A protein has these predicted regions:
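Conserved blade-register residue in beta-propeller folds
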Residues: 126-128
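Short beta-alpha junction loops
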Residues: 119-124
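A short, conserved, highly charged catalytic patch centered on acidic carboxylates
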Residues: 2-114, 130-185
Length: 185
């Protein structure tokens, strides 16, 4: 009798915990969608990019030595047939996604996408992928469309060093597995 009661209490606690986890996941997903919408509005209204230049949730095929996988990002801005910047939105710590955006920008094209940004809507880090440096810490420091067009004029497609390519692909692939939303949409 005591064992049955303990088992019933354990199952009830499990149910409560699972409901709480699901609720928190739904809140995080809603926050992420809010960040993505805010970034889209910023790109269009403040930065003056055209909607047709911004790819939303694009997927890229990644060929590793032993498998092939699809990886994605929130936004890619393409100018003059060149992927100019990748943008990853986060509902929590942007630091945890810095490595992903850098690896992603280095490996999804046959050249390094020159810029990457990760943001939670408040904070941001903007990276120059070729030099490896941080060039901005706010979404407001992101290039406006005309500045981006000026930068792309002299852009030379530089592939990532082949001896480091597999490692970067594996980093992008590993992050892809952990970024899936936990809540079914």
């Amino acid at each position: 009798m005591i064992n049955e009661r303990n088992e019933a209490q354990r199952k009830e606690r499990e149910k409560i915990v699972m409901e709480k986890v699901k609720e928190e996941e739904m809140i995080a997903q809603a926050q992420l969608e809010g960040v993505k919408e805010w970034v889209w509005d910023l790109l269009i209204t403040e930065k003056k990019f055209r909607p047709e230049e911004i790819k939303i949730d694009p997927q890229f095929s990644l060929k590793l030595s032993d498998c092939e996988a699809m990886v994605g990002i929130d936004y890619v801005i393409n100018l003059n047939s060149i992927s100019f910047i990748v943008i990853k939105c986060s509902s929590s710590s942007i630091e945890s996604w810095e490595r992903y955006v850098k690896a992603f920008a280095r490996v999804v094209q046959n050249y390094q996408i020159p810029y990457a940004m990760v943001t939670d809507g408040e904070n941001a880090k903007i990276f120059d992928i070729i030099s490896g440096s941080v060039i901005g810490i706010s979404v407001h420091e992101l290039f406006k469309r005309q500045e981006a067009l000026d930068k792309i004029k002299d852009f030379i497609k530089i592939p990532f060093p082949p001896e480091k390519l597999e490692r970067e692909k594996r980093i992008a692939y590993a992050f892809e597995g952990i970024k899936c939303p936990a809540v079914k949409q």
